[in-house]
C-alpha cells in the first residue's frame, strides 16, 4: 500500500490497521443493508445548536462531558490529540471492513485496503502474543503524491458491518486540519442500519480549492495535515477515528 500504481495521477499508502474516513454516501444493499444515496448536510433544516455556533471548546472540556454530541465537536478549533471516546463505547459493534479511494473524474483507484478475516486475525494474535493495542483500527496514515491536492472530487467507498442492535441516526462528522487551520468539515448521515447487516457506502469528497502557498506547505510538511472522524448514533459519540496525511509520495 505504498503507491503500488506508479501511473496513477495520485497514489496512496497507509500504515496501521486503518481508521476509515469519508464524505457523501451511497448505501447499497448487501446482507440486509439499505439502498440509498444521501447528500451532505447543506440546506437541510436542523436545530441551530447543531451548527456548532458559539464559543470554541477545547478537547479537555469535551473529555469532561458524560455525552459528546455533534454540536460539541463542531466547535473544536483544532485537531484532537486524544480519543474522545473509548472502543467499548461502540455498543453497536460497527466494524469497518473495507476501504477504497478513487478519483471520480478518471475512475482511477488510488488506494484500497481490506480488513483481514477473523481467522487471519486470530492467527496473527496467536503468533504475536503480548498486549493488544486498544487503539488498533482507530488510526490510519496516508501518503499521497502532490497531485492529490489538485483533485476536485474523490470517492471513498467503505464497507461496514453492524452487530445485533439496530443503528438509528448514524452520522459522521469529519474535520480536516493543516496545522491549526480547519481546511474542511464533512458532515454526513448514514441514516438507519438494520441489525446484523453489511453496508457499503461511497463517500464523495468535494475538496476545497487551496492556494499555491498552502499546497506547497502541505507538501513540504508531511503528516501535519490531520483529521478527526467522529461517529454518532442518536446524537451520541460512539466512535472516534484519526488520520494523518503526507503529500510527498513519489518524490
Curated annotation (Swiss-Prot):
InterPro entries: Ig_E-set, PDE6D_unc-119_myristoyl-bd, PDED_dom, PDED_dom_sf. Changing residue 207 to A: Reduced binding to myristoylated proteins. It comes from Homo sapiens. Keywords: Acetylation, Cell projection, Cilium, Cilium biogenesis/degradation, Lipid-binding, Protein transport, Transport. Its main location: other. GO terms for cellular component: ciliary transition zone; cilium; cytosol. The keyword Transport applies. Coiled coil: none annotated. Found in a complex with ARL3, RP2 and UNC119B; RP2 induces hydrolysis of GTP ARL3 in the complex, leading to the release of UNC119B. Interacts with NPHP3 (when myristoylated). Interacts with CYS1 (when myristoylated). Interacts with MACIR; interaction only takes place when UNC119B is not liganded with myristoylated proteins. One of its GO terms (biological process) is lipoprotein transport. It holds the Pfam family GMP_PDE_delta. Gene3D superfamilies: GMP phosphodiesterase, delta subunit. It is found in: Cell projection, Cilium. This is Protein unc-119 homolog B. Myristoyl-binding protein that acts as a cargo adapter: specifically binds the myristoyl moiety of a subset of N-terminally myristoylated proteins and is required for their localization. Binds myristoylated NPHP3 and plays a key role in localization of NPHP3 to the primary cilium membrane. Does not bind all myristoylated proteins. Probably plays a role in trafficking proteins in photoreceptor cells. GO terms for molecular function: lipid binding. Adopts an immunoglobulin-like beta-sandwich fold forming a hydrophobic cavity that capture N-terminally myristoylated target peptides. Phe residues within the hydrophobic beta sandwich are required for myristate binding.
Amino acid at each position: 500500500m505504498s503507491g503500488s500504481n506508479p501511473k496513477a495521477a495520485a497514489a496512496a499508502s497507509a500504515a496501521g490497521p486503518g481508521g476509515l474516513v469519508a464524505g457523501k454516501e451511497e448505501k447499497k444493499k448487501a446482507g440486509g443493508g439499505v439502498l440509498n444515496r444521501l447528500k451532505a448536510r447543506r440546506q437541510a433544516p436542523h436545530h441551530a445548536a447543531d451548527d456548532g455556533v458559539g464559543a470554541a471548546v477545547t478537547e479537555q472540556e469535551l473529555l469532561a462531558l458524560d455525552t459528546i454530541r455533534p454540536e460539541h465537536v463542531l466547535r473544536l478549533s483544532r485537531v484532537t490529540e486524544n480519543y474522545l471516546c473509548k472502543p467499548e463505547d461502540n455498543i453497536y459493534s460497527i466494524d469497518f471492513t473495507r476501504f477504497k479511494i478513487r478519483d471520480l473524474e478518471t475512475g482511477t483507484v488510488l488506494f484500497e485496503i481490506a480488513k483481514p478475516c477473523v481467522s487471519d486475525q486470530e492467527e496473527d494474535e496467536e503468533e504475536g502474543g503480548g498486549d493488544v493495542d486498544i487503539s488498533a483500527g482507530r488510526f490510519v496514515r496516508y501518503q499521497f503524491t502532490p497531485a492529490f491536492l489538485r483533485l476536485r472530487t474523490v470517492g471513498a467507498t467503505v464497507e461496514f458491518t453492524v452487530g445485533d442492535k439496530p443503528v438509528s441516526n448514524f452520522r459522521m462528522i469529519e474535520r480536516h486540519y493543516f496545522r491549526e487551520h480547519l481546511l474542511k468539515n464533512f458532515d454526513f448521515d448514514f441514516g438507519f442500519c438494520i441489525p446484523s447487516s453489511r453496508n457499503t457506502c461511497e463517500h464523495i469528497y468535494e475538496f476545497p480549492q487551496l492556494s499555491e502557498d498552502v499546497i506547497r506547505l502541505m507538501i513540504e510538511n508531511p503528516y501535519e495535515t490531520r483529521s478527526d472522524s467522529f461517529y454518532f448514533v442518536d446524537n451520541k459519540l460512539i466512535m472516534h477515528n484519526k488520520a494523518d496525511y503526507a503529500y510527498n509520495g513519489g518524490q
